[in-house]
Amino acid sequence: MRPLAVIGSLSRDVVAGSEPRIGGGSWHAARALRALQLGATIFAKCGEPERRDYQRRLTATGLPATLTTGGDTTGFSMSYDERGIRTMTVDAVGEPWRARDASPDLLRTVEWLHVAPLLRSDFDADTLKRLANGRRILFDGQGLVRVPAVGPLVLDGDFDHDLLRHISILKLAEEEARAIIGDAELESLTSLGVPEIVVTFGLEGSLVLARGTATRVPAHTVDADPTGAGDAFAVAYLAGRADGHAPVSAARRATALVAALLTGRAR
């Protein structure tokens, strides 16, 4: 597999009234990579109060990890209904990533990079342009549509379209896709100009838009806490693409791997 990395902020999550715990795309991706025995480098960011604990947790994954600190740690409160639909509140907005936070020297061997923003403010177009130099980017659509404001999480399509020029693969949850295109057919997402788009439907699988075709990939039914499943799917998908799988094959592989991960059967 070609060199793979994940970059994104960590979060402080409160799930269904529980004690705060570490979260964020880079964390859930790291856990998935460890469980699936896939190698990658992790670049993460958080506020100073969480630095020591979060560094320890990243180190425990056994993956090479660099933790940058600055500003607040992004905070969320969330709950799930019986269908796995999540309701979220933004408790704190973290500091954006800047180009200096991920040194070119650290990224020089990386060919496939999963960019895992929590909110729209995490990565601007200039930072993403630098990250995309010489590598393929899978970008989580949270970084397009999640409004960076404290309170109930708001999604809208008011993002900088210049970001799209630097994205090779765009991963969107269905509600994120709807924030962009409204009630239009999901196939209309191809008008964004991103070569490869994957829309996920939680417990109902995904849709792959690539190479001029739209292909539904069914999910594997599991009874488990779905927190982090989208991040695990994204990094497993990118690992499949880095390993030479075509888009639909990578989605099927990622679906099976995430189901195994959620049910504790990952290799």
Each model region followed by its residue ranges:
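Conserved beta-alpha-beta core of the PfkB/ribokinase-like small-molecule kinase fold
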Residues: 112-187, 205
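Short beta-strand scaffold segments in enzyme catalytic cores
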Residues: 31, 76-79, 206-209
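Active-site metal-binding loops of divalent metal-dependent hydrolases
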Residues: 8-10, 232
